[in-house]
Amino acid sequence: MAAAATAAEGVPSRGPPGEVIHLNVGGKRFSTSRQTLTWIPDSFFSSLLSGRISTLKDETGAIFIDRDPTVFAPILNFLRTKELDPRGVHGSSLLHEAQFYGLTPLVRRLQLREELDRSSCGNVLFNGYLPPPVFPVKRRNRHSLVGPQQLGGRPAPVRRSNTMPPNLGNAGLLGRMLDEKTPPSPSGQPEEPGMVRLVCGHHNWIAVAYTQFLVCYRLKEASGWQLVFSSPRLDWPIERLALTARVHGGALGEHDKMVAAATGSEILLWALQAEGGGSEIGVFHLGVPVEALFFVGNQLIATSHTGRIGVWNAVTKHWQVQEVQPITSYDAAGSFLLLGCNNGSIYYVDVQKFPLRMKDNDLLVSELYRDPAEDGVTALSVYLTPKTSDSGNWIEIAYGTSSGGVRVIVQHPETVGSGPQLFQTFTVHRSPVTKIMLSEKHLISVCADNNHVRTWSVTRFRGMISTQPGSTPLASFKILALESADGHGGCSAGNDIGPYGERDDQQVFIQKVVPSASQLFVRLSSTGQRVCSVRSVDGSPTTAFTVLECEGSRRLGSRPRRYLLTGQANGSLAMWDLTTAMDGLGQAPAGGLTEQELMEQLEHCELAPPAPSAPSWGCLPSPSPRISLTSLHSASSNTSLSGHRGSPSPPQAEARRRGGGSFVERCQELVRSGPDLRRPPTPAPWPSSGLGTPLTPPKMKLNETSF
């Protein structure tokens, strides 16, 4: 169909401006003039018609361009009229094609349109930004330090790692800066050392884990978020992170805040001080890879799918490891810890009580319930109703199974001895249930089929779940979130979709569609409705996120606030106000100019690149460090605007008008200059480009702040 031809054989490098040029763009024919195609210098078409780019012609002699004809139509219309009519073409596609063709005026206009809703300062939900912390030094050695610790009245050795504070001598305490190659992650791929891997929060505290160290921030009412702790560099990537900021009944004195990190089978625990700093409590071993790490009250819990559970008690400072059935799920409420196992059993642990049997030193782990079909319990959620009597709470447990079933079991406080009773069963999933949440108003389940979500409305009577009329179906939707195959999209534990939020409040899912995305979507967990979307203010990919319920201020009328925390690939941390987003749910946005309105306004000006000349019209240059999209005027418009009908003014009078002499002298000079100077000056004639530009009225070159 098409035959290749050089510029010498095809279109002559020079020709009359009115010469008709025939184009074949993606199989669609266009005809226009050389003048229309070449009025923008150094563009694709100027190079093509000047012979600098070889041409390809079809059988009719038209120049063939292998691009999308639908997108080319508005581009050709812009070349003809200098007006932009997108004609239904998406802005990003139009910008991409304009950049390909080298149409600088159109590129600037489209970039300005994209900047309409984007800002380096975020939107109304943007609440704060924490820059990447300073990388800590690495210890030269990995020698362990042993310190005595009391257990049951006798000293017991507790292994301490190289992360002890530097007050134990000079051996190996100073190290090289971060110049060594980062060790590979468990997936075998190298990790970015400055990437945020995990984020977690508790009350007014935040813990952020990077590849080989972690930092903690504390929110102070007057000064905002303050860095209070930074760990030394570790030897291996951090895979799990846990934080507790309120320990009731602990015996740690001022160290009532703790942060824990797990790497492989090793767990490191630090005590944090409210005013800054921290000290290492110890290093504990589970013996198998840690797959879940969390606090229940003042107990640190670590679990593995192999069936091993480790518990550290803040009061007794005792680390205990117990073997149970292979663990596939867990949940905690109050002081209760529930473990779901692959044999269909649900085990119960009361971690608030002394967790040891005196005769054999085992944890008090008891079987609470067994699934009727003995399917593996792959998701767990426990809900404690408010106390209605002195006998205790009504315990409600929802769990999902490996076969896709969803069951609800309940236990009345007066029938504790008889065990929980099966209350309801749903078989709406055909894939294993991966998440489940039973809250005050909703039952939510998520299965492995691309995060397929099913929700039900829960009916309650006096706080307890009721069968009249029972749970009714509410919504079905998906939270599509693709995972990275090479491990570069962030740690999977740091990209949990949720649901997040208190069980007696609206809960949300956080959706990151692709691993390298810089935009997150916040959706109601009950209906899937979008609450808001946030985009990283610096354009870097989001690698970890979580939702934090922050305590309210002590000021009158304040209330707790909910924040979305996003960790970025460059190490920064951003905060977004979800409380404001939830309050504005359902309200129509009252914005400024729409994209179409902005394009209509831009038709009356011509955007130019930044120029080193001084600003005119009393406008000041933008203080933004990023390159401006526009210029106040070009070099061709440096002619004085104060002269009559474009003629230059006398140099003495011009100097006096620009600031020479006193105020009275300048006023007298204006009077002597004649009445014509008080009229608007006549602009200088529009300079001819010599290329025979299309017959369009001249357009002023303005700065983006001018409109």
Curated annotation (Swiss-Prot):
Domain BTB: residue ranges: 19-88
Keywords for the protein's UniProt record, in alphabetical order: Acetylation, Lysosome, Phosphoprotein, Repeat, WD repeat
List-wise, which residues carry Phosphoserine? S647, S649
* UniProt motif (PXXXPW) ranges: 681-686
Q: Which domain of life is it from?
A: Eukaryota
Which parts of the sequence carry Phosphothreonine? T163, T696
State which residue ranges cross the membrane.
Answer: none
Q: Where in the cell is it found?
A: Lysosome
Its chief place of residence is other
Pfam families named in the record = BTB_2 (PF02214)
Q: Where are the WD repeats?
A: 185-225, 226-278, 279-318, 319-362, 363-420, 421-466, 467-518, 519-577
List the PROSITE patterns hit by this protein, alphabetically. BTB, WD_REPEATS_1
Low complexity biased stretches: 628-642
Known tissue expression:
Widely expressed.
Intervals of motif PXXXPR: 621-626
> Which residues lie within the region annotated Disordered?
145-165, 628-707
Its GO biological process annotations read: positive regulation of epidermal growth factor receptor signaling pathway; protein homooligomerization
Q: Please give the GO cellular component terms listed in this UniProt entry.
A: lysosome
Q: Which residues carry this modification: N-acetylalanine?
A: A2
Which function does this protein serve?
Answer: Inhibits CBL-SH3KBP1 complex mediated down-regulation of EGFR signaling by sequestration of SH3KBP1. Binds to SH3KBP1 and prevents its interaction with CBL and inhibits translocation of SH3KBP1 to EGFR containing vesicles upon EGF stimulation.
**Subunit structure, as described in the record:** Monomer. Interacts with CUL3; interaction is direct and forms a 5:5 heterodecamer. Interacts (via PXXXPR motifs) with SH3KBP1 (via SH3 domains). Directly interacts with cathepsin B/CTSB.
**Protein family according to the UniProt entry:** Belongs to the KCTD3 family.
Protein name as it appears in the record: SH3KBP1-binding protein 1
Gene assigned in the entry: SHKBP1
